[in-house]
Amino acid sequence: MKVKKISAANVEACSLPKLFDEEKIDFQPIQCVNWAEYPYKPKVSFRIAHTQNSILLHFKVKEESVRAKYGEDNGSVWTDSCVEFFSIPAGDGIYYNIECNCIGTILVGAGPVRNNREHAPKEVTALVQRWSSLGNQPFAERIGETDWEVALIIPVSYTHLRAHETSLHL
């Protein structure tokens, strides 16, 4: 997949859907479910682009129900309705994952394997701009088909979690 580089100064996360439309960046469907013990497969698609300094993501989700229990970063957002982005920006085997629930609360982790990952401090998570179509306040499970979207602007400096500079290679 080719990831488009765009020139967008001072773009806000809430403007990403419109910007991606203007730049004609298509949605890509997510077709796999990685956990046999969790076979539920909501309809999910995403768009991605980058600037010189940021990764831009826009997710669209359709689910049978939706929940946003966690409102503080680095909480258990994976138990909420959420999406996830993985990258290995420095090519050093350290991968970063950013999990984002349906209200824009994130968990940022880094490490070579799934377990014992280092979580980003609040100073790093605060750098990630977010927008959610469902707002940003936690809520209990809402039963019934729900469409939601989140947009993230992730500065390349989020890899400072590991205290090193990197360049974006997409």
Residue positions per predicted region:
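Order/disorder boundary and secretion-linked terminal/linker segments
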Residues: M1-K69
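Beta-strand-rich interaction surfaces with strong enrichment in secreted/lumenal proteins
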Residues: S45-F46, N136-R142
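Beta-strand-connecting loop/turn residues
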Residues: N53-I55, I103, T146
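Extracellular/luminal beta-rich ligand-recognition
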Residues: E72-P138
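Localized edge beta-strand/strand-to-loop motifs within extracellular or lumenal beta-rich domains
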Residues: W148-Y158
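Conserved small/polar residues in nucleotide/adenosyl-binding loops
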Residues: T159-T166
